[in-house]
A protein has these predicted regions:
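Bacterial N-terminal signal peptides that target proteins for export
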Residues: 1-6
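Bacterial N-terminal signal peptides
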Residues: 7-16
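Bacterial Sec-dependent N-terminal signal peptides
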Residues: 15-35, 563
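Short S/T/G/P-enriched beta-strand
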Residues: 27-66, 72-99, 188-248, 256-257, ...
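Conserved small-residue
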Residues: 39-148, 154, 159, 165-166, ...
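Conserved hydrophobic/aromatic pocket- or pore-lining residues that grip, position, or stack substrates
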Residues: 180, 258, 289
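Beta-strand-rich extracellular modules
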Residues: 183-185
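Inter-heme linker and motif-flanking segments adjacent to c-type heme-binding CXXCH motifs
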Residues: 187-192, 213-245, 262-563
Length: 563
């Protein structure tokens, strides 16, 4: 079934993107200054991109990997500078990971290009994405792998790299690497960073919709007998949809043509008249299926509880997945999806949001808007070791006694995010984590990693952090951006002091008379907290402290009162 309703939006945005990233590639000398070097910070915006394994029956999501990037000029004197498109360009190229897996082309790896026109109204060459980005080996020229400049976010952006989770040797790799390089006007490479482009086809329907399964019980109606189980399941979905909704769907079907999804509204025009008459894609998937997860876990991890195994998690029945496990990284061992997002009914907007629950306040009291009214860092990271807002019905605390274990209050069926705007860990007002910036104008994701993949994550995720600062984990080394040691004080990210030997020599002077500025991270008893852990193993003043060591006064010497 042809779905041209999105064609105009895709075409308009595609033409705008083809206008280039601005900049024309002027040399970056003005931004770098004397003695400058460069760093490229880049990350996938979501931490995972789901893509249909086949587009022959219906499509939920196309190949569309988004990467944000910033270029920092390091200076031997003075602060570093974040460069714009008038000073530098950013391009990407394929690079092998430590196992030798490389993904440079999408040609021959999917039937997407066969169905792009009837599904998305886009006439594309093989290897070309919906907004004009290309896979490196498929691109007809450098423009196809050059990032544009996103003026609204003030960074470089690659919208919609059409990558699939199959490498050039035909092997499955859902976490392939791509090299993002800053180049000057002559095309000379100034700096590069290797970044994961996470992508997974593990968005399967067959667990429930394959013939004979719970949603396609034998004898109920004439189900598909396609030998390909995923194709069979998808055909059964259309059969069931026709029976329930009175439709007569003809493949290929773009689900979002009726069920609005902001992820596919690239022009940002909002739902069409046709879409307004139907539930959003999130509602018809999450809320509708919420009571059909018998035997699966659709609840947050309780204090002291363990994270359910991947095959038992409700979200992983459709999101990638029991094998992919796209929720990975620093929080994975303590929480599951529901600790942040709430259960499936909440995600689908079955209950109205509480006051302050919507991203901009305009949607309070209404069903949550997919892709916008989402959990925030400040919801769990609401305070520090000495200050945390009083929250009625506050969720339980994590074992560290500082962070909330859930992002919403107890008993809230809407899972409205807790607001703690004064927290040192809060996003910018009215912005999601993935759209916020912090210290020095860097994107939050540039230093902490992608949403759902906060460093440390899997080995390929950790490559970027290791290249930028010498070890995995969040960017915590001042030297990642500062050639000259930053000045003493608490002007670092989230009010941090400088890291390294220079601070060891200077911290006593700072502590004397300013103990209250130490306690938010080192604790009221100055014995250290989770907020004062070592980012890496280092030797300071002759004492070696392992990564993860909680540092307080007593780690190295007596406390502030001589005890």
């Amino acid at each position: 079934m042809a779905r041209s309703i999105l064609a105009a939006a895709f075409t308009a945005v595609s033409l705008a993107a083809c206008g280039g990233g601005g900049g024309g590639g002027a040399t970056p000398a003005g931004g770098g200054g004397s003695g400058s070097a460069f760093k490229v910070f880049a990350n996938n915006d979501l931490g995972m991109h789901c893509v249909d394994e086949s587009f022959a029956v219906f499509s939920i999501l196309p190949p569309y990997n988004v990467v944000d990037a910033q270029v920092v000029a390091l200076r031997s004197s003075g602060p570093p500078a974040v460069l714009d498109a008038s000073q530098v360009q950013v391009r990407y190229s394929a690079v092998a990971d430590a196992t030798g897996s490389i993904n440079s082309t999408s040609v021959g790896k999917s039937d997407f290009w066969q169905y792009a026109l009837p599904l998305y109204g886009a006439s594309l060459a093989a290897g070309q994405g919906l907004q004009g980005m290309w896979m490196p080996a498929d691109a007809p020229g450098a423009a196809g792998t050059t990032l544009g400049w996103d003026a609204s976010m003030g960074l470089f952006k690659a919208p919609g790299i059409p990558i699939f989770p199959v490498d050039d040797a035909g092997h499955l790799n859902r976490y392939p690497l791509m090299r993002f390089s800053a180049v000057d006007g002559s095309g000379a490479v100034l700096a590069s960073t290797d970044v994961v482009l996470p992508v997974s086809e593990e968005t399967s329907c067959q667990s429930c919709h394959a013939t004979g399964k719970a949603a396609a019980p034998t004898g109920a109606m004439a189900w598909s007998s396609d030998p390909d189980l995923e194709a069979q399941a998808r055909k059964n979905v259309l059969i069931l949809h026709d029976a329930r909704a009175g439709t007569a769907l003809q493949a290929p079907v773009l689900c979002a043509s009726c069920h609005y999804s902001p992820a596919l509204d690239l022009a940002g025009t909002g739902p069409s008249a046709q879409q307004q008459g139907h539930g959003t894609m999130s509602a018809v998937m999450h809320a509708f299926h919420a009571d059909k997860m018998a035997g699966l876990v659709d609840a947050p991890v309780a204090p002291g509880g363990g994270v359910p195994s991947a095959p038992l998690q409700a979200c992983y029945q459709c999101h990638p997945g029991a094998t992919t496990q796209c929720l990975r990284g620093a929080m994975t061992t303590k929480v599951d999806c529901q600790n942040c997002h709430g259960g499936m009914a909440a995600v689908g907007g079955a209950a109205p949001l509480r006051a302050g629950g919507s991203m901009d306040g305009s949607n309070d009291g209404k069903p949550r808007r997919p892709w916008l009214d989402l959990p925030r860092c400040q919801s769990c990271h609401a305070g520090d070791a000495v200050a945390r807002p009083t929250v009625a019905g506050a969720p339980p605390l994590a074992a560290d006694g500082i962070r909330f274990l859930n992002a919403y209050v107890n008993g809230d069926a809407s899972a409205s995010p807790i607001l703690a705007a004064s927290s040192r860990f809060a996003e910018q007002p009215g912005k999601l984590y993935r759209k916020s910036k912090g210290h020095g104008g860097l994107a939050c994701e540039a230093c902490h990693g992608s949403t759902h993949a906060i460093w440390s994550a899997n080995p390929n995720d950790d490559v970027a952090a290791t290249q930028l600062q010498g070890h995995a984990g969040v960017i915590g080394e001042c030297s990642a951006c500062h050639q000259a040691p930053p000045s003493e004080g608490l002007g670092g990210p989230h009010g941090m002091h400088p890291v390294g030997a220079a601070w060891v020599e200077a911290h006593q002077d700072r502590a004397e008379g300013h103990l209250s500025s130490c306690s938010p991270c080192h604790g009221a008893d100055f014995r250290g907290t989770v907020l004062s852990r070592m980012f890496s193993t280092r030797t300071l003043a002759g004492r070696t402290l392992a990564a993860g060591t909680v540092v307080g006064c007593y780690t190295c010497h007596d406390g502030p009162n001589g005890d």
